[in-house]
Protein backbone atom coordinates (compact mmCIF):
# COMPACT_ATOMS: atom_id res chain seq x y z
CA UNK A 1 0.00 0.00 0.00
CA UNK A 2 1.24 3.50 -0.85
CA UNK A 3 -0.26 6.70 0.46
CA UNK A 4 0.12 10.06 -1.21
CA UNK A 5 -0.61 13.51 0.09
CA UNK A 6 -2.63 14.60 -2.93
CA UNK A 7 -6.33 14.10 -2.12
CA UNK A 8 -5.32 11.48 0.51
CA UNK A 9 -5.04 8.80 -2.17
CA UNK A 10 -4.06 5.25 -1.33
CA UNK A 11 -2.67 2.87 -3.95
CA UNK A 12 -3.38 -0.73 -3.01
CA UNK A 13 -3.60 -4.11 -4.68
CA UNK A 14 -6.98 -5.06 -6.04
CA UNK A 15 -9.19 -7.28 -3.93
CA UNK A 16 -12.29 -9.32 -4.71
CA UNK A 17 -14.49 -6.53 -3.32
CA UNK A 18 -13.26 -4.24 -6.12
CA UNK A 19 -14.57 -6.45 -8.94
CA UNK A 20 -17.70 -4.56 -10.00
CA UNK A 21 -16.11 -1.14 -9.94
CA UNK A 22 -12.91 -2.24 -11.69
CA UNK A 23 -14.84 -4.03 -14.43
CA UNK A 24 -17.09 -0.99 -14.86
CA UNK A 25 -13.96 1.15 -15.36
CA UNK A 26 -12.50 -1.42 -17.76
CA UNK A 27 -15.66 -1.21 -19.87
CA UNK A 28 -15.25 2.57 -20.11
CA UNK A 29 -11.50 2.34 -20.81
CA UNK A 30 -11.85 -0.36 -23.47
CA UNK A 31 -14.66 1.46 -25.25
CA UNK A 32 -12.48 4.58 -25.57
CA UNK A 33 -10.03 5.46 -28.32
CA UNK A 34 -7.15 4.77 -25.90
CA UNK A 35 -7.10 1.06 -26.80
CA UNK A 36 -7.15 -0.98 -30.00
CA UNK A 37 -9.80 -3.53 -28.99
CA UNK A 38 -13.08 -3.27 -27.12
CA UNK A 39 -12.45 -6.31 -24.94
CA UNK A 40 -15.33 -8.31 -23.50
CA UNK A 41 -16.81 -9.08 -20.11
CA UNK A 42 -15.11 -12.49 -20.26
CA UNK A 43 -11.70 -10.90 -20.85
CA UNK A 44 -12.27 -8.26 -18.16
CA UNK A 45 -13.22 -10.94 -15.62
CA UNK A 46 -10.23 -13.10 -16.61
CA UNK A 47 -7.92 -10.10 -16.19
CA UNK A 48 -9.44 -9.12 -12.85
CA UNK A 49 -9.25 -12.63 -11.40
CA UNK A 50 -5.66 -12.99 -12.63
CA UNK A 51 -4.81 -9.77 -10.77
CA UNK A 52 -6.25 -10.96 -7.45
CA UNK A 53 -4.89 -14.50 -7.74
CA UNK A 54 -1.32 -15.61 -7.18
CA UNK A 55 -0.57 -15.29 -10.91
CA UNK A 56 3.11 -14.22 -11.06
CA UNK A 57 2.71 -12.40 -14.38
CA UNK A 58 0.10 -9.75 -13.55
CA UNK A 59 -0.70 -7.31 -10.76
CA UNK A 60 -3.68 -5.03 -10.32
CA UNK A 61 -3.89 -1.82 -8.30
CA UNK A 62 -6.66 0.59 -7.42
CA UNK A 63 -6.38 4.26 -6.48
CA UNK A 64 -8.66 4.97 -3.53
CA UNK A 65 -9.71 8.11 -1.67
CA UNK A 66 -12.21 8.01 1.19
CA UNK A 67 -13.40 4.50 0.18
CA UNK A 68 -14.01 5.58 -3.43
CA UNK A 69 -12.06 3.96 -6.25
CA UNK A 70 -10.73 6.72 -8.51
CA UNK A 71 -8.99 4.50 -11.04
CA UNK A 72 -7.03 1.32 -11.58
CA UNK A 73 -3.89 -0.08 -13.18
CA UNK A 74 -2.83 -3.51 -14.39
CA UNK A 75 0.81 -4.48 -14.80
CA UNK A 76 2.18 -7.44 -16.76
CA UNK A 77 5.63 -8.81 -15.94
CA UNK A 78 8.15 -10.02 -18.50
CA UNK A 79 11.88 -9.90 -19.26
CA UNK A 80 13.56 -7.66 -21.84
CA UNK A 81 16.48 -9.29 -23.63
CA UNK A 82 17.21 -5.96 -25.30
CA UNK A 83 17.80 -4.28 -21.93
CA UNK A 84 18.82 -7.38 -19.94
CA UNK A 85 16.36 -6.94 -17.09
CA UNK A 86 12.83 -7.43 -15.86
CA UNK A 87 10.19 -5.49 -17.76
CA UNK A 88 6.91 -4.27 -16.34
CA UNK A 89 4.28 -3.47 -18.95
CA UNK A 90 1.72 -0.96 -17.78
CA UNK A 91 -1.15 -2.64 -19.59
CA UNK A 92 -4.00 -0.55 -18.21
CA UNK A 93 -3.86 2.82 -16.50
CA UNK A 94 -7.27 4.37 -16.08
CA UNK A 95 -8.39 7.29 -13.94
CA UNK A 96 -12.04 8.32 -13.86
CA UNK A 97 -12.54 11.45 -15.91
CA UNK A 98 -13.63 13.60 -12.96
CA UNK A 99 -10.35 12.82 -11.13
CA UNK A 100 -7.93 13.43 -14.00
CA UNK A 101 -5.54 16.33 -13.49
CA UNK A 102 -5.10 15.56 -9.77
CA UNK A 103 -1.60 14.02 -10.23
CA UNK A 104 -2.83 10.46 -9.63
CA UNK A 105 -0.84 9.22 -12.62
CA UNK A 106 2.31 10.94 -11.36
CA UNK A 107 1.74 9.44 -7.93
CA UNK A 108 1.37 5.98 -9.49
CA UNK A 109 4.64 6.31 -11.41
CA UNK A 110 6.39 7.44 -8.20
CA UNK A 111 4.91 4.34 -6.53
CA UNK A 112 6.28 2.12 -9.32
CA UNK A 113 9.72 3.73 -9.05
CA UNK A 114 9.79 2.85 -5.35
CA UNK A 115 8.69 -0.78 -5.65
CA UNK A 116 10.42 -1.62 -8.94
CA UNK A 117 14.00 -0.41 -8.81
CA UNK A 118 16.19 -1.10 -11.87
CA UNK A 119 13.23 -2.43 -13.84
CA UNK A 120 12.25 -1.40 -17.35
CA UNK A 121 8.77 0.17 -17.44
CA UNK A 122 6.94 0.09 -20.77
CA UNK A 123 3.54 1.17 -21.98
CA UNK A 124 1.59 1.89 -25.13
CA UNK A 125 -0.21 5.12 -25.95
CA UNK A 126 -2.19 6.37 -28.92
CA UNK A 127 -0.58 9.31 -30.77
CA UNK A 128 -3.76 11.34 -30.23
CA UNK A 129 -3.67 10.97 -26.43
CA UNK A 130 -1.68 14.16 -25.84
CA UNK A 131 -2.46 14.51 -22.09
CA UNK A 132 -1.26 10.95 -21.43
CA UNK A 133 1.88 11.43 -23.53
CA UNK A 134 2.66 14.60 -21.59
CA UNK A 135 2.27 12.76 -18.28
CA UNK A 136 4.45 9.88 -19.46
CA UNK A 137 7.22 12.17 -20.69
CA UNK A 138 7.17 14.15 -17.42
CA UNK A 139 7.49 10.82 -15.61
CA UNK A 140 10.63 9.92 -17.60
CA UNK A 141 9.22 7.75 -20.39
CA UNK A 142 10.74 8.03 -23.87
CA UNK A 143 9.15 7.38 -27.24
CA UNK A 144 10.63 4.28 -28.88
CA UNK A 145 11.25 4.13 -32.63
CA UNK A 146 9.47 0.76 -32.96
CA UNK A 147 6.21 -0.27 -34.51
CA UNK A 148 4.21 -2.53 -32.23
CA UNK A 149 2.98 -5.75 -33.87
CA UNK A 150 0.91 -8.68 -32.65
CA UNK A 151 -0.42 -12.06 -33.65
CA UNK A 152 -3.55 -13.00 -31.75
CA UNK A 153 -4.09 -16.75 -31.87
CA UNK A 154 -7.33 -18.16 -30.53
CA UNK A 155 -7.52 -21.87 -29.77
Short names for language-model regions:
Residues 9-24:
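A short beta-loop-alpha structural element at the N-terminal edge
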Residues 106, 127-145:
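Conserved active-site alpha-helix within GNAT-family acetyltransferase domains
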Residues 99-111:
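Conserved acetyl-CoA pyrophosphate-binding loop and the N-cap/start of the following alpha-helix
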Residues 122-133, 149-154:
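Conserved beta-strand-loop-alpha-helix junction that forms the acyl-donor binding cleft
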Residues 50-62:
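A short helix-loop-beta-strand connector motif used in the catalytic cores of GNAT acetyltransferases and
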Residues 27-50:
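Conserved GNAT-fold acetyl-CoA-binding loop/helix
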Amino acid sequence: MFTGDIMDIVIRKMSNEDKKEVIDMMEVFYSSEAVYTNGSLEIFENDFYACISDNPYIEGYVFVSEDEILGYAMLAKSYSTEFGKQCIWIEDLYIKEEYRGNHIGTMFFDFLDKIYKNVLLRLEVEDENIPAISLYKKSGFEVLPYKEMMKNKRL
